[in-house]
């Protein structure tokens, strides 16, 4: 399983340095990579355990227009069927991950 961490700062901008000890604490859950997102009061971090799309599944994952960002710890078992549905609706995929299926599904809603 991957590991995710995050927080919303109560006042002002999030301190990116505050994510480091959180990610260090869960690093054993995701030895294959680490990524962060910090903007305004929001901070998200991800420790990756590569299972699907070993080369292209880095997180956080951003929408094409950069308006949405997601970190995900889980597995969508029917992601291939959902990929086909979303492709038929005109969505294009940059990765082969179930995380991108989640992101594009949220955009589609």
Regions found by a protein language model. Name each.
Residues 1-107:
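N-terminus-centric sequence/structural signature that marks the extreme N-terminus
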């Amino acid at each position: 399983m991957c590991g995710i961490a995050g927080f919303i700062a109560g006042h002002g901008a999030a301190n990116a340095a505050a994510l480091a000890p959180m990610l260090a604490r869960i690093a054993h859950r995701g030895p294959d990579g680490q990524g962060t997102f910090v903007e305004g009061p929001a901070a998200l971090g991800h420790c990756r355990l590569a299972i699907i799309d070993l080369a292209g599944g880095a997180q956080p994952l951003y929408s094409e227009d950069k308006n949405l960002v997601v970190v995900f710890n889980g597995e969508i078992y029917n992601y291939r069927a959902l990929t086909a549905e979303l492709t038929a609706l005109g969505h294009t995929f940059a990765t082969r991950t179930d995380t991108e299926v989640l992101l594009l599904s949220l955009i589609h809603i």
